[in-house]
Amino acid sequence: MKKQLVGFVKYFIFWLTFFLHAKGLFVAWNSDQSALLSGAEIGGIFWHGLIMDISTACYLLLLPGLVLALRPLLAAAFINRFIKLYTILLLVVTSLLTVADLGLYPHWGTRVNVTIFNYLDDPVALSASLSIVDVLLGLLLCGALVAGFLYFFKKLFPDGIADTKKVSWFYLPLQLFLVATLILPIRGGLDTSPLNLSSVAFSPKMYVNQAATNYMWNFAKSVEKRKRLANPCMYMAEDESQRVFKEFHSRDTLSQRPQLIKLKDGRQPNVILIILESFSNKVIAPLGGLHGVVPYLDSLCTKSTVFTSFYSTGNRSDRGISAILGGYPSLLSTSIMVYPEKSSSLTLLPEYFNRKNYHTSFYYGGDINFYNLKSFVLQGNYKRLVTKADFPSELGRMTKWGVPDGYVFERATQDLKTDQEPFMKTIYTISSHSPFDVPFSRIQGSSHSDRYLNSV
């Protein structure tokens, strides 16, 4: 029994070693870009990407783990043969994708994903990116990876993983428990948000964050996303929709643009952008909402510029943020935030301020890895990020989503005393997100509506 438990751990090390080698190959293959990186950035590619490599390795352990749990019922020879064939098959698949990733990245600028299948039936389009020499070198490298790691596998398990001795029935629930615990590293930990591309992002440089990503994880995720990309908006014929779009695009609906801010002596104004989570005109009295829910906002409306015909671009936070910061309209079935290879082509709002020598910062009291938010804001080149990790841990545990907004605003206000001008500060709130567990109670009641009104 001990041999199988040790073997299970060694099998995890086997796949983790494979992915670390693949990452090293990627960095070496793209030496023209890697040579421009510092030692800390190269090390960060491996360190920050380790959580995704571990997650992917644990995915590959699920099926062998379940088969090993059946050792009291199945012969050791059968289990060892099954795991060996499973390993050979996966080595071929992962090695082919490794080579495809290396060959296509310099041309496409993205890690290998499901779109590669779009070109398998079109060799002419594929040959535009790859030469015959590339293909031959790729096949040679693929064969070397399979042969090298198959040799490594035989060295690790000369007699197989399954114990040839009699195994107690006690082993079955123990092994099943071990397989169940794999869910934790697969998910990426106990944080609110599961593992995503933001979990490994740590640099404003797109290449660095892409290199930290596990290519197999990225490929599997792209397969999952592709299932959700059917167009839900086919309400008219293609030619009619094009005509309507072009007609709308050619209009200038605002004949005279008002000057909202009058600058004094040519000074650049400081800018604070507050993104309010789950807000609505229904709680703001001057916009036709309830009275007395948000008295300070109501007061601001009487002495500010208020847009009374302003409509949401979407119904999810990630789609709102991509519209506010990236000027990108909402996609009904997905969000551009989860496609870094696409969002990297956007020029985000803070980048315009950076060009004017502003000091830019982003404040968010929650887990910034949630829904790929970190990767997105890093693309905007914010000079400073303040997140849940920058607050005492007890504050981060006060609510489900993280640090209550009050403490985040206190931190932002405190930073104003030392911020160099001009500055552009973005504050994204979380307390008004379900389940609305704010640390005070101004509006009584336990219904969903009461808790929401209390949170805003």
Protein language model regions, located:
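The feature marks either
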Residues: 201, 205-260, 267, 302
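Alpha-helix initiation and N-capping motif
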Residues: 18, 113, 123, 213-216, ...
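Long, well-ordered, tryptophan-enriched scaffold segments
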Residues: 135-141, 239-249, 377
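Solvent-exposed soluble domains appended to multi-pass membrane proteins
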Residues: 245-456
